[in-house]
Amino acid sequence: DAGLLGGGSNPGPGEVSLAHNGVLFLDELPEFRRSTLEVLRQPLEDGKVTISRAAGTVTFPAQFMLVAAMNPCQCGFYGDLKRECRCSPPMIQKYRQRISGPLLDRIDLHVEVPLVDFKALSSAEIGEGSSDIRERVETARGMQRERFAQHAGVHTNSAMTPRLIKKHCALDAAASAHLEHAMSQMNLSARAHDRILKVARTLADLGGTDHLTENHIFEAIGYRTLDRNFWA
């Protein structure tokens, strides 16, 4: 835990603070001790780490982007259409429960990555170029800088306060109804509700529009796949 958060008799920064304004990548997420993963909750929520010692309290900045990867089960083949999973249902459940619901709640995008077959790997077809993606992202970031120019400490949609979410994530009737249905069916928390709106706002920015639509909400909810089936 000290390596991740920081600590010691003379407290120093841990990995989360060293990743401040950058990316912290954790591979094989369930292989970390659950107690180690749980300490990520405070910095993910507050953007800082506070370490208390007898001599006093030290606070380190920790505004980082968490990127994590994991297998669907211990053998890695659960859900694979070509290879049989060797894990029993209790084994899969135990493996996945190493990641708590509250931590999962703080991760905005859940993406399931299917196996890429040989045909796709060897294909000569070229996808969207990184330069085009970068241009779109820079345009979206420019929209956000302009949007939050009068709000100190807020530079991106992810940092929006509840008041800013209400102001900049207004929904029409169709989008609101879709979000309400998802909240009920997936038993989502208030935190997940706000994070869905932030992601939807970003999707709209990437599309170059100020108006949030039902499609933006639908896509943002689609990125909460682990909320829907993680504990099934």
What is the role of each PLM region?
Residues S17, E31-F32:
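Extended, folded domain segments that form the structural surfaces/walls around functional sites
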